[in-house]
Amino acid sequence: MRTTTLGTHGPQVGVIGLGAMGMSFAYDMATPRDESTSVSVVHQALDLGVTLIDTADVYGPYTNEELVGRALAGHRDRAVIATKVGMECIDPTGGPGGSPLVKPNGRPEHVRAAIDASLRRLGTDHVDLYQLHRVDPEVPIEETWGALAEAVAAGKARHIGLSEVSVEQIKRAQAIHPVTTVQSEFSLWTRDVQAEVLPYCEQHGIGLLPYSPLGRGFLAGRFASFDELPQNDQRRRLPRFQQDNLQANLDIATKVSEVAERIGATPAQVALAWLVAQGPHVVPIPGTKTPKYLADNAGAADVQLSPADLADLDAIPAPTGARY
């Protein structure tokens, strides 16, 4: 697979990463998880050159890192492990639909304890990228970021990054310690970061990690109606997936499919290739627990979109419905 680096100073990774969240959390929770398949998907990812594996302590809650750790046992040197801190579970079933209820926690003492817990769960002595999951509105970002910087100084993290932040917040963090990456929702139907965050990151050599790069499966053509969403799936609670909005948004998926058919690729590959084309250090992290979807996603690294293809995709209208 083609490679790039996480920003100008970060580690080398494949241009397509892997988000591990869905192996333990959030999507299709009524279906039992098959850990052996998830482990094999991680191994398959490494074989395909998908080396950036993204998780978080709160996913599961607190089981996704363990799964990633088991999958990478004996393969640690082949992977670039990215995990996150800054959210904590306060009730495993207290959220909507019985989902975990989580809230931000950016207190430095929480970060200091959390990195050690993450390393234990992951079975490693360091993570390659330690990310602030969300900024805690009750804690100055300088204090939280300083605690992440301590993890670097202690050799527990090689690099640190941010998630879902504004340019102002990036600047405040940069004044304390270099920012290697910013993770944001970014796809053909969520393009907010193009206004300010993406240009700033490119100007300052910061990598951008788009999560939900396939619009939570929608851009890949996985479903065309609300009723096709699995029961106990968090997408059933999101505005864009409500039936009226979903029907209005089908034109977006259709346009992606038209480009895919024209160039002999899949819709998922087109959506991911569009993201890779947005900058030299943009590394999408699509999530999957299915071998065939992983292979499909990895194949996006070989898809070259022409200027005409990019223009057609850029012209796709904004979606109907808010993100949350």
Which residues are covered by each model-predicted region?
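Alpha-helix N-cap and loop-to-helix initiation/capping positions
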Residues: 30-37, 63, 67, 99-110, ...
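Structural motif
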Residues: 44, 48, 121-122, 155, ...
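Conserved beta-strand positions
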Residues: 18-20, 55, 129-132, 162, ...
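Active-site groove signature of glycoside hydrolases
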Residues: 119-136
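Beta/alpha (TIM)-barrel catalytic core signal, keyed to glycine-rich beta->alpha loops juxtaposed to Asp/Glu
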Residues: 3, 135-137, 141-324
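N-terminal small/glycine-rich loop or linker at the start of catalytic domains
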Residues: 9-30, 82-102, 126, 131
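Short, acidic/polar
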Residues: 31-45, 104-122, 166-170
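N-terminal binding-site loop/beta-alpha segment at the start of enzyme catalytic domains
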Residues: 1-80, 231, 322
